[in-house]
């Protein structure tokens, strides 16, 4: 599977000084080690890895061979983007009748780095949060997400991971999610929010800047609407929709995101659900979405 293909991949280098980048396999292993050491005594599963955007090449000796004569050993590959998740199933809680497991997610995208330069710190994204076992939706809260982790070697990466795990407050995060289940909205309010989310994307930039960010695409907003009608776990057509279910409609729609925008949108789903929940209780910041 993906585990094998990232081990057999070549490692891109910085072209000005030929210095190695930290490859995907080293990224996964480093975070796996950090998780096992931080959560010692818990069951820490092996990473589940996804890769995309394959980049193929040939070794120099095979440059002049016709394609049909290439041996496997003549070919090189690497993947521009990789993501993985590591579950810790012994740390779990039930929210809104759904079992949530602690989960760590990492994302790496070479397309967001300048490989044409000399070696500079490399960009990684790392999150710790809870994964909904019913649907595998990922729940991420601000203090569990580093969207701009820049490190030069695996030692720094390991240290940054431990720091993130240490700063994360699972009890606070769970409390926040449990609160969502206590508020509901009518179909009319839901339709209003969906409409406003669609309008949001067409607003002039200045107007948009004055509002909280909303990162879901048009297609994703449509799938939130579809899931509201059809989803067996979180659909609420014909009845009140509680905010925990609304939140899961958002995180569910985010599953169609490319690897490199997935975590930002996961966090944004939390911001939207918590913000709209507060607006329903009279808070001003997300008021525009419900008016």
Question: What positions do the PLM features span?
Answer:
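Acidic, low-complexity, intrinsically disordered interaction modules
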Residues: 7-17
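A short acidic/basic microdomain associated with nuclease active sites
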Residues: 38-76, 80-83
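Short, small-residue-biased leader/transition segments that mark boundaries at the very start
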Residues: 1-6
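Intrinsically disordered, low-complexity regions enriched in serine/threonine
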Residues: 67-291
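Amphipathic alpha-helical segments
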Residues: 17-45
């Amino acid at each position: 599977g993906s585990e094998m293909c990232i081990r057999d991949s070549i490692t891109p280098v910085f072209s000005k000084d030929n210095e190695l980048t930290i490859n995907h396999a080293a990224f996964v292993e480093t975070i796996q080690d950090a998780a096992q050491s931080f959560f010692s005594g818990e069951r820490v599963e092996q990473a589940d890895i996804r890769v995309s955007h394959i980049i193929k090449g040939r070794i120099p000796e095979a440059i002049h061979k016709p394609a049909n004569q290439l041996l496997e050993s003549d070919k090189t590959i690497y993947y521009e983007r990789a993501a993985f998740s590591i579950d810790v199933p012994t740390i779990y809680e039930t929210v809104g009748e759904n079992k949530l497991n602690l989960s760590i997610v990492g994302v790496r995208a070479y397309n967001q780095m300048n490989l044409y330069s000399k070696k500079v710190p490399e960009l990684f994204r790392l999150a710790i949060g809870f994964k909904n076992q019913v649907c595998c939706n990922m729940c991420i809260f601000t203090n569990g997400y580093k969207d701009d982790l820049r490190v030069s070697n695996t030692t720094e990466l390991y240290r940054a991971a431990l720091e993130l795990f240490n700063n994360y407050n699972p009890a606070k995060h769970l409390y926040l999610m449990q609160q969502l289940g206590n508020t509901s909205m009518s179909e009319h309010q839901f339709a209003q929010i969906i409409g406003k989310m669609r309008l949001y994307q067409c607003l002039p930039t200045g107007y948009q800047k004055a509002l909280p960010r909303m990162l879901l695409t048009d297609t994703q907003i449509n799938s939130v609407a579809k899931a509201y009608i059809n989803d067996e776990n979180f659909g609420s057509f014909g009845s009140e929709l509680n905010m925990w279910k609304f939140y899961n409609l958002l995180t569910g729609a985010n599953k169609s995101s490319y690897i490199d925008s997935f975590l930002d949108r996961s966090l944004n789903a939390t911001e939207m659900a918590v913000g709209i929940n507060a607006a329903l209780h009279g808070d001003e910041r997300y008021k525009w979405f419900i008016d």
